Amino acid sequence: MEMTSTQRLILANQYKLMGLLDSQNAQKYQRLEAIVKGGFALELKELDKEFSDVSEQECQTVLDTLEMYNALQTSYNNLSDKSALTPHRLQFAGYCAVREKKYLNYLRFITGVEGKYQEFMRCEHGCDSQVPMWDKYMRMLDVWHACPHGYHLSMTEIQNILNA
């Protein structure tokens, strides 16, 4: 992370203030203040880890995935015979907190800050799937988009989407 001296001074002061305001995390903020003041390039990279770039396309894909799960659950609830599939199978897994952190952060923003798709935050482990899910969701979206009635899916269509 490259910063001017002025930016470093401002950030160091912010960390100093945060340490005074948040005594439980004071040691963490003192460390970060020392890193910024010292201009330690290796440790400054830590500051970048909190920032991610999620493109408009990626944001839309996350939203499309949530819509797809909404359609899956709505369609399932409207079926008269649900015996071929358990409701647990329709549960949204989320994204991997290690490998897909930026998608998980966007999901948490959409559900927590924006208040949308609240029903999906009932997923296990805070929606940390603990395995990468992006590619799986992309395959599922392809199958879902090929269905003629996106919100009136048959049991076979639901199973095809889940098995993609």
UniProtKB/Swiss-Prot annotation:
Please report the name of this protein according to its UniProt entry: UPF0304 protein PM1500
InterPro entries on file: UPF0304_YfbU (IPR005587), YfbU_alpha-helical_sf (IPR023146), YfbU_helix-hairpin_sf (IPR023145)
Q: Which family does it belong to?
A: Belongs to the UPF0304 family.
Task: Give the matching SUPFAM superfamilies.
Answer: YfbU-like
Originating species: Pasteurella multocida (strain Pm70)
Q: Which Pfam families match?
A: YfbU (PF03887)
| Top-rank lineage group of the source organism | Bacteria
